[in-house]
Structures are given as C-alpha cells and as structure tokens.
Amino acid sequence: MNDLVPNEFYLFQNFPNPFKEKTTIKYCVAYKTRVRITVFNTEGEIIEMLIDEEKEAGTYKSEFPQAANILLEDKSDKQLKNGNYLYRLEAGNYTSDKQMILEK
C-alpha cells in the first residue's frame, strides 16, 4: 500500500478499536529503513512481531493478529484475553507506542 510517499514516520491508531477478532494498524515510513511492529501485553511480554523487515518509503497496513491460532478458545498461553495491549513502531530513529483494546 504505497499511495503517497510520506515525509515523516507516523503510527496511526488501530481500527477498529476496541476490536473483537482482528484490527488494522496503519503506519508511514519516511525513507527506506528496517521497520518493526511489535504487540505487547500490559506486562511487557511480546505477543506477536507483526513486521520485522526493511521497507521502502510509503504508507502501509498490517493486521493483528496474524498468527492463525492466536485467538483460539483454548487454555494455551497464546490465547489473547480481553483487555489492553500496546503496539510499537520502530523505524529509523522513530519509536511510537499506541494502545488497543480487545473485547471478545
């Protein structure tokens, strides 16, 4: 999704928020660099690494969760519970965190 080339890095609020099953995270990359988007629980544990790759300048979207089994209704450690989660964009010298809410 490379519509217009942005002149700065930016992390948008996810949509929808709150979400039930999936949500979309949109972000802008100002120049070619390594991009990482990580989702954490409120205890700082990594839930999922959405992106960890070099990207050209542009505007992108990524869905959370990406792992097919992450929302299964079982007792595994991978099951997401209702509540707040943080997601972080790291690109170049830019870092930004946002909060999202899961309400099943």
Give the positions of each predicted feature.
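Generic detection of short hydrophobic beta-strand segments and adjacent strand-loop junctions
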Residues: 52, 62-64, 98-100
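Glycine-centered coil/turn sites that cap beta-strands in beta-rich domains
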Residues: 1-15, 19-39, 49, 61-73
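Extracellular Ig-like/FN3 beta-sandwich strand-entry sites
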Residues: 32, 57-59, 82-84
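Solvent-exposed serine/threonine-rich low-complexity stretches and specific carbohydrate-binding patches
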Residues: 47-56
